[in-house]
Amino acid sequence: MKYIKRILKIVGLVIILSLALAKLNIIFIRKSDVKPWDMINKIAGYFNEDKPYDVIFFGTSHAYCSFDTEDLAESGVTSYILASQKQPLEATYYYIKEAIKRSKPKAIYVDVLDALAMNEIDEGSVHTYTDYFPMGINKAMMIKDSLPPEEWAENVMPLIKYHTRWRSLEEKDYKAKW
């Protein structure tokens, strides 16, 4: 009985610590909410909704700068642009996997510029596609496949990167809900 109580206490502590770290990640993460690069609304917004879409666009900034969902809506086509700056194809693959769990689109469009441009990894751009992606196996695999090992920890747990932001926190940081 003592053994079971001890295990339950440890499991309870792990759950409490995990929830606290998850909330701290949300509070400390940089809030990229200035248009047109408002990744909070583009990425976290999609994963917090439960709406079906006919068409979903993926890829680099060329996708969100080139397609207009409002034009498609006028034709009766529901669409979403799930793209980010310099999003590598390795990340796009996991974006598609995660997106089709929530919506069964009739068409998927992938901007393949990254395959042609051979962009170098740029820390700011990396965080635009990793920070707001939901935690889970697809996020872990996306980070493993698209980034060098020395960058894995801060992208799985953004608090490692942003822990020094505590002096610049604003009210909106505490109200973030994704």
Regions found by a protein language model. Name each.
Residues 5-26:
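Hydrophobic membrane-insertion alpha-helices, especially the h-region
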Residues 6-10, 29-38, 58-62:
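Short acidic/polar alpha-helix capping motifs at helix-coil junctions
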